[in-house]
Amino acid sequence: VTTIVNTDQDQAWNGPEGAHWARHQDRWNAVNDGFNTPLLDAARIADGHRTLDIGCGAGHTTRLAALRAPHGHALGLDLSGPMLAEARARAVADGIHNVTFTRGDAQTHPFEQSAEGPFDAAISRYGAMFFADPELAFGNIRRALRPGGRLALVCPSDPELNGWVTAMTSLRGILPVGDFGRPGLPGMFSLAAPDRVRAVLAAAGFTGVTIEETRAYGTWGRDATDAADFLLATGPGRHLMDSADEPARARARAALTDHLGAHETADGTVRLLSTAWLVTAERS
């Protein structure tokens, strides 16, 4: 049984935020799927391998890892009960049987007691930035790997190189938009500085750290109006809209729709660039 020490994130991901992500999982996959192949290739998952997916959410990358190792196994770990329920249902619907999902805190989860371990690879697509104590978490993840086991993760780089951030900051004259996090503090951009990533992984005992930039376009909506509605329903957008009066909300929605209109493609869909770090390391 995991002791949950990351209580702030536990409350967030088992409340409205977790419910939102579970409900809109297909949309979030449309945003982030461009990172799947680089991530899984970097993890070097082979048939028979056991893979640990950290912050697995609704389990899309966990299922992809399981498909790469039909005679292996994939374990998805997340704090969010709503997203894990979705993950289990989708695995059943897809007929993927070599996958399991567990609710737990990567900082403290007793991986050494897991029947699925030790693991050949640990992966994370945008799920490793929210630890209250990242050194503790990554140290625990390292111990879950076999000697020679491999870590591969994708995490956002500079906020200004991510189109959704640029879209939201365009509203600063209308809504009280602050920054979206910074290296060293739990949040989306806690690992945005490569030196911070190297320091955390070194403190956790990882070796052979590599960090390279990777970019992908994600689909945020079927048109600018739909994309604006979606962005304003996400965690940051929802909090900003809740803090504003109705005239400000209407102005923000119109301004964001106008901004996103410049990113509509030939079929009308809105595609925004995301820039991330692809990080790998090993347990020696």
What residue ranges belong to the model's regions?
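Conserved catalytic/acceptor-binding region of the Class I
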Residues: 135, 150-222, 238
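Short glycine-dipeptide loop
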Residues: 71, 145-151
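Conserved class I S-adenosyl-L-methionine
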Residues: 2-49, 60-64, 86, 105-108
